């Protein structure tokens, strides 16, 4: 086993994981990218864990399908269209992970020649044909196990995007086989570079996949969404006790919302909350799903008031709803507002008439950006994807369609049930109401 493979295993699974990393956890991650029989463009997830890779791939696949494809019927995909969609999506994610866009890409594959011999000896019977062995080896996870699988992988490098695209297409059958998700994950990690990832992760000793529960870390999700393996979801970097905590530095193509924000465990910044396309990964305590729409008006450019709210909140990292009055000048400069000392003092007195030494967000926005509501339509068609069969209506992996109504205020006449998905979406649209076409709300788990 090469030194690089050992480093990769340590980064993904942790140092103490190798001997016993529970083969159960490893087996949960050993699946390919497989399309649902009930929904031509939806990927299936067989067990808990690999949603950290499958959900981002699904989100980028939808971006390609809805906003770059000329298909009139986006829910019908032939096998050839599935192949093209998946391969283009994998290339897009690899391209965004490529450090400084250096043009150096990696693909990790399985040494099939060795695998044939290994599998034959493991199963105790000689291979009757290479095709048969290839099929059996793709299913032989339990026999291969964690250590042996990692002894059989190899890396190939490519210097240009066209070369990479050809190779990804050539290896299409590999992406669908039993190890496709892991091989793609390893390809992303080596394209990014192990050292680069360690420099971005807050705690490099924490593995990307939890060795006990098998869930992917936030760093892993962020890497696939943005190309950066940072551990936080806020905008920009922050300092805490002299330590620099890295966040998201630019608007993401695909967004991220989490139930953890509704439960007040974290706050997602606007770079993830307001992405370039109306597609969001939605996180619960244990699973990732995808919420999306086809209406680009949902991601219209930030209104000045929304930009002001975002900037104000960067100076209010604890989400108190106020800043010390000493920071008012910095906020006004960041927003290109008049910021000469005399005017600043005038504003301090106006916004803090009681002399408490704080500036509240509400009065600040009302003073400088009055009557500017949030942009975007009031009603729109939405869809939800969950890759787990057992979590879907009728146990079929299909998009659930619904109508979302977004008001600028609470309307008791429109109020719908309080569900986890609604609570999660309220972190983006506080007064959203949802009406689904199925008998029950889609599950986040």
Curated annotation (Swiss-Prot):
Recorded catalytic activity of this chain's protein: Thiol-dependent hydrolysis of ester, thioester, amide, peptide and isopeptide bonds formed by the C-terminal Gly of ubiquitin (a 76-residue protein attached to proteins as an intracellular targeting signal)
UniProt cross-references to InterPro entries, sorted A to Z: EF-hand-dom_pair (IPR011992), MINDY-3/4_CD (IPR025257), MINY3/4 (IPR039785)
Subcellular location: Nucleus
Active site: 51, 287
Protein species of origin: Homo sapiens (Human)
Keyword Phosphoprotein: yes
Gene Ontology biological process terms, A to Z: apoptotic process; protein K48-linked deubiquitination; proteolysis
Upper lineage: Eukaryota, Metazoa, Chordata, Craniata, Vertebrata
Protein's UniProt name: Ubiquitin carboxyl-terminal hydrolase MINDY-3
UniProt KW keywords: Apoptosis, Hydrolase, Nucleus, Phosphoprotein, Protease, Thiol protease, Ubl conjugation pathway
Top class in the EC scheme: hydrolase
Assembly behavior: Interacts with COPS5.
